[in-house]
UniProtKB/Swiss-Prot annotation:
Keywords: Acyltransferase, Transferase. The keyword Signal does not apply. This is Acetyltransferase YpeA. It is an enzyme of class 2 (transferase). Its EC number is 2.3.1.-. Belongs to the acetyltransferase family. YpeA subfamily. InterPro entries: Acetyltransferase_YpeA, Acyl_CoA_acyltransferase, Bact_Acetyltransf, GNAT_dom. It comes from the Bacteria. It comes from Shigella boydii serotype 4 (strain Sb227). GO terms for molecular function: acyltransferase activity, transferring groups other than amino-acyl groups.
Length: 141
């Protein structure tokens, strides 16, 4: 397995992977999300590749105060092999190298499988309520 930075030629394969991982939401246009990331610190957008196939992703961010991780997904046929752990570990190292003191991840409360993985990796539940406000309406995907 190789973990590397996203490249333009990964575009369609990544969107297909996100569909398989059930990461797409009607209110988010994944093509726009990728375009936006490519224009703003693509070095934190990582893919895991096995035998030339993209099997995992994580899209990281850092605002100078906190890091974040989005679009963490692993192809269903490749789960249980430590790929998500490796992606998060690499992202964490990149954030630490920038002086990032903390990373936050938003997870649906009912996603027990993923919550368990994050807890095993040392993530703790923060008594915070995540609020959001859409500033630009994407077309429904």
């Amino acid at each position: 397995m190789e973990i590397r930075v996203f490249r333009q030629e990964d575009f369609e394969e990544v969107i297909t992977l996100w569909e398989r991982c059930d990461l797409l939401r009607p209110w988010n246009d994944p093509e726009m999300d990728i375009e936006r990331k490519m224009n703003h610190d693509v070095s934190l957008f990582l893919v895991a590749e096995v035998n030339g196939e993209v099997v995992g992703t994580v899209m990281g961010g850092y605002d100078g105060h906190r890091g974040s991780a989005y679009y963490l997904g692993v192809h269903p046929e490749f789960r249980g092999r430590g790929i998500a752990n490796a992606l998060l570990n690499r992202l964490e190292k990149k954030l630490i190298a920038r002086g990032c003191p903390k990373i936050q991840i938003n997870v649906p409360e009912d996603n027990d499988m993923v919550l368990g993985m994050y807890e095993r990796l040392g993530y703790e539940h923060a008594d915070m309520l995540s609020l959001g406000k859409r500033l630009i309406e994407d077309e429904e995907y």
